[in-house]
């Protein structure tokens, strides 16, 4: 059985298939992550429309017998041209795409659909400095959808409120949780040290609306702390090395 259908989709990646064709990986709320074949050479108008990070209305022809999907048309709603004009924004979008693909959107297609599209929309209209903070929010929210966010409010050992802690705050890699200075074992060499500002930021991203969370400023040193911490976590939780993170030297 074969059928024509339409849906809204985000282009995650495009790769060559044969001499003139391409295999396109999409994300949609209805179908999740799926591949579709785009036929046509370099001069194809449709080929120009179906490019990474474009979002729009997609028409497909599904051949159930051959287990294949063919792209018949694509109406772009959002091009995100600003992403291609900035190296850091391009890197952020590439990271987003790789993470979504390698985790199969955590099986939470509608939630990741909203998060990924919101992230790409946001970095398109933001400054590079704003993008660096948006990148941190994106990872922490993604970890939340994975169901792996640890408690940022209380010490793992004594229950002290970390927001009001006047001492240092540590994340124990072995115990996978935050520990106050009084409970921290100095012999533990597998940890991240975070400022109270970093903890408050993570709490805000979890509890506040995206608009409210965007208004929270960060010092440069805190941004660096969180980048090192969150990229470690996402690599750990995905169970694989993300190539975009490995290639980030010179970009960040």
Predicted feature locations:
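Non-catalytic alpha-helical scaffolds and adjoining flexible linkers that form interface surfaces
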Residues: 1-23, 27-252
């Amino acid at each position: 059985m074969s059928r024509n259908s339409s849906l809204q989709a985000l282009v995650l990646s495009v790769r060559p298939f044969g001499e003139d064709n391409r295999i396109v990986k999409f994300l949609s709320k209805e179908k999740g992550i799926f591949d579709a074949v785009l036929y046509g050479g370099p001069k194809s108008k449709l080929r120009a429309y179906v490019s990474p990070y474009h979002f729009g209305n997609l028409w497909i022809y599904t051949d159930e017998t051959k287990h294949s999907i063919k792209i018949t048309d694509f109406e772009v709603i959002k091009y995100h041209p600003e992403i291609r004009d900035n190296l850091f924004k391009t890197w952020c979008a590439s990271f987003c795409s790789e993470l979504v693909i390698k985790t199969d959107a955590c099986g939470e297609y509608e939630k990741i659909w909203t998060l990924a599209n919101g992230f790409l929309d946001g970095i398109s209209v933001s400054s590079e400095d704003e993008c660096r903070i948006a990148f941190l929010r994106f990872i922490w929210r993604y970890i939340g959808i994975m169901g792996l966010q640890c408690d940022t409010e209380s010490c793992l050992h004594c229950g002290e409120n970390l927001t009001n802690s006047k001492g240092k705050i540590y994340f124990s890699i072995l115990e996978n949780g935050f520990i106050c200075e009084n409970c921290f074992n100095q012999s533990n060499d597998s940890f991240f040290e975070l400022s109270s500002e970093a903890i408050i930021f993570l709490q805000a991203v979890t509890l506040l609306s995206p608009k409210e969370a965007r208004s929270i400023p960060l010092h440069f040193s805190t941004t660096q702390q969180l980048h090192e911490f969150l990229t470690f976590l996402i690599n750990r939780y995905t169970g694989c090395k993300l190539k975009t993170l490995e290639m980030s030297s010179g970009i960040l």
